[in-house]
Amino acid sequence: MLRQHQDSLLLRFAQGEEGHETTTQLSCLVCVDRVSHTVDIHLSDTKIAVRDSLQRRIQGGGGFHGLRIR
């Protein structure tokens, strides 16, 4: 069988394999799992994403209006 290839923005040495991944440092990445078609969102500051609705109203939305991560 063919080995399944993972497209990712991680550094090549972090994955343990060689590939065509970019080494650009990004603060926010969105990765889609090809098997289950789910989205995994990686944020540099998770405190912004997990605030409750009262904190968002007081502190501002931070550009994540309507985004729910569970």
Curated annotation (Swiss-Prot):
This is Protein FlmC. NCBIfam families: PRK13720.1. Component of a type I toxin-antitoxin (TA) system. Either this protein or sequences upstream of it are required for translation of downstream flmA; this could be translationally coupled to flmA. It holds the Pfam family DUF5431. It comes from Escherichia coli (strain K12). The keyword Signal does not apply. InterPro entries: DUF5431. Disruption phenotype: A plasmid unable to express the start codon of this protein can be lost without detriment to the bacteria, when normally the plasmid is not lost due to the Flm plasmid maintenance system. Keywords: Plasmid, Toxin-antitoxin system. Induction: Part of the flmC-flmA operon; the antisense antitoxin RNA flmB of this system overlaps the ribosome-binding site and first 3 codons of this gene on the opposite strand. The lineage of its organism: Bacteria, Pseudomonadati, Pseudomonadota, Gammaproteobacteria, Enterobacterales.
